[in-house]
């Protein structure tokens, strides 16, 4: 698909009508849900009202009007809404059964704490947090109010992107990741449905339910990223560091070029086979880093020489070289070759990726070197609590946010004028928000990303 290139403040744009005409990868059928969309006549109190959204009930502050379902996943349901106080459109995520078990409760706490800490233009902003319940005993629902974007990256991947758009989107991903890494936060769940964009090519990273701080003394968990985007060190049950996210970015970039998933494994074993068939069997030096049982399995697999990157990503898959920014297929391919490296010790860092010729044409110190977020809960990932203890911690966070909120925006977050959706673009209360194509909170299924499944014996333990 060929799109005209437009310049908007020297940055690329995307044709939202063409790019985002499809629904996102895991969507709610709005037309069928809206038929059952009715306001409850019984108000919770004078601040809240209830709306039936499919099989769920949203009990929200009156300031949020015209709720329309736009997405659902294992961890929540998302509605677009109009915020009458801020005069802008927002996304409201209701966490699904946050206190169902310890894993759900810990994820909810982690997501809330990290979203309150981060403050970067390439990470989704938390605008408000609330619960309709008034006491800890009644507490059961958590609502997160965020910026509303136009679509997730799943739709963009299907477009024929020119080099400007591709490199600018990647630059923004890397800026957001660097901001997280600067505070020792590893996202761990980067995938196209967790990255959202607007038609002006603004990009933001979503979903911190699986993010964790680096350096935890606990065994890191393998079931953390949708299988297709998992780094080799995750597949093989090794410890991992920040550049586990860089592998995921490489997979996303490769998908932008090929328009299909790079390593579509059916399970861990098939995933590993898909990787080595294309990139080659790793060297003995890497094998020595594996647990004995895993190493024994890997060493007994067929050996693959792998393909060169010009064969994996030939020029025919890339757009024409850019005259404006001198961006070339050879540069993009070189970046891919540095990201898609099996041995994490040899994989490019986020800092070096931002300095790569394919990326640094957009380099802005204010974006790259933004002050790191301050994580106030230093034991965020070492914490182990009962469900009731997690519930109390989350309730305190919500109450604390409500006290600190002024004019509906959590202190420390960008003001409406700096958010992705300008107030001039907001729809009045009587308008429809059905033209907002998507904002995905698509969570992968528990079988793919259940962080409760610890790596005590390595993910390839089934091969023993």
Swiss-Prot record:
Q: Which residues carry this modification: Phosphothreonine?
A: 221
Composition-biased stretches (Polar residues): 433-454
> Where does this protein hold ATP?
70-78, 93
> At which residues is a lipid of type S-palmitoyl cysteine covalently attached?
462-463
Where does the protein principally reside?
cytoplasm
Name the protein family. Belongs to the protein kinase superfamily. CMGC Ser/Thr protein kinase family. MAP kinase subfamily.
Per UniProt, subunit arrangement is: Interacts with MAPK8IP1/JIP-1 and MAPK8IP3/JIP-3/JSAP1. Interacts with SPAG9/MAPK8IP4/JIP4. Interacts with HDAC9 and MAPKBP1. Interacts with ARRB2; the interaction enhances MAPK10 activation by MAP3K5. Interacts with SARM1. Interacts with JUND; interaction is inhibited in the presence of MEN1.
What exactly does this protein do? Serine/threonine-protein kinase involved in various processes such as neuronal proliferation, differentiation, migration and programmed cell death. Extracellular stimuli such as pro-inflammatory cytokines or physical stress stimulate the stress-activated protein kinase/c-Jun N-terminal kinase (SAP/JNK) signaling pathway. In this cascade, two dual specificity kinases MAP2K4/MKK4 and MAP2K7/MKK7 phosphorylate and activate MAPK10/JNK3.
Protein's name according to its UniProt entry: Mitogen-activated protein kinase 10
This chain's source organism reads Rattus norvegicus (Rat)
